[in-house]
Design a protein with these regions (language model features):
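Helix-to-loop junctions at the C-terminal end of transmembrane segments
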Residues: 164-183
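C-terminal transmembrane helical hairpin of 12-TM major facilitator-type secondary transporters
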Residues: 179-230
């Protein structure tokens, strides 16, 4: 249990540092693409450390061997970290808890309409998150698909669609303003859930389910790319780690 806590602590700390680094190092015009790539990496990491790791541990390697393999996969990440460029702006390191936590919060809440910004952050992905939490139950109990069918479609096609959506969203954000991307992708996120309504009023068919899951995850990936770019834009580079951690925690 103690080892699990240490691993989780280190993982969360590394996540915060990475979010702060990408916020500091990426110029405004590259944040959409950067957000898309970070979503891609996150989803691939979920796939490798989740379903693939469970399958390999059960069939071939056992848990000890699996953890050694997962540790080895971190070596390229360490090399990439050593080669990564430093941010161009030199920012003083916080020397007290007040500078590290209190000042970033004062800076954020001192902005105009700070509470409206927080409301947007909380609500932007909320409906999509609710819908996704109900999807599996709806497809099994509401429509009548079996758990195996739903699992295969959600874990393979759904993951693939999320990755494609994030990358496509990043490409589109090179041509759209952040506001337009958030608006269009947000509307698509909401509209994509209509596919499940169609499933409820039509005959059960595997292709129909796959299409609904694909479209919903595609639009969700596009929305996630725009949303991460928004969080990066809202952060003051002097306080990027604390502010990104705060905003991402609220969105979760």
């Amino acid at each position: 249990a103690a080892l699990a806590v240490v691993i989780a602590f280190c993982s969360a700390s590394q996540d915060i540092v990475f979010d702060a680094w990408k916020t500091d190092v990426l110029p405004a015009e590259e944040r959409g693409a950067g957000a898309a790539i970070s979503v891609l990496g996150y989803r691939l990491g979920m796939l490798v450390s989740g379903g693939l790791a469970l399958w390999l541990a059960d069939r071939y390697m056992g848990w000890q061997g699996m953890y050694w393999l997962m540790a080895a996969l971190l070596i390229p990440c360490i090399i990439a970290t050593l080669l990564a460029p430093e941010p161009s702006d030199v920012i003083p390191v916080p020397r007290s808890l007040e500078q590290a936590v209190a000042e970033p919060l004062r800076d954020f809440f001192g902005r105009n309409n700070a509470w409206l910004i927080l409301l947007l952050i909380v609500l932007y992905k909320l409906g999509d998150a609710f819908a996704m939490s109900l999807t599996t139950t709806f497809l099994i109990r509401g429509v009548g698909f079996d758990a195996g069918e739903v699992g295969v479609v959600n874990k393979t096609l759904g993951l693939f669609a999320t990755i494609v959506g994030a990358l496509y969203g990043g490409v589109l954000m090179q041509r759209l303003t952040l506001f337009r991307a958030l608006l269009i992708f947000g509307i698509l996120q909401g509209a994509s859930n209509a596919g499940y309504w169609l499933l409820s009023i039509t005959d059960k068919h595997m292709i129909s389910m796959a299409a609904a899951v694909f479209f919903e995850n595609l639009c969700g990936g596009m929305g996630t790319a725009a949303f991460v770019a928004l969080l990066m834009t809202l952060c003051n580079k002097s306080f990027s780690a604390t502010q990104f951690a705060l905003l991402s925690a609220l969105s979760a």
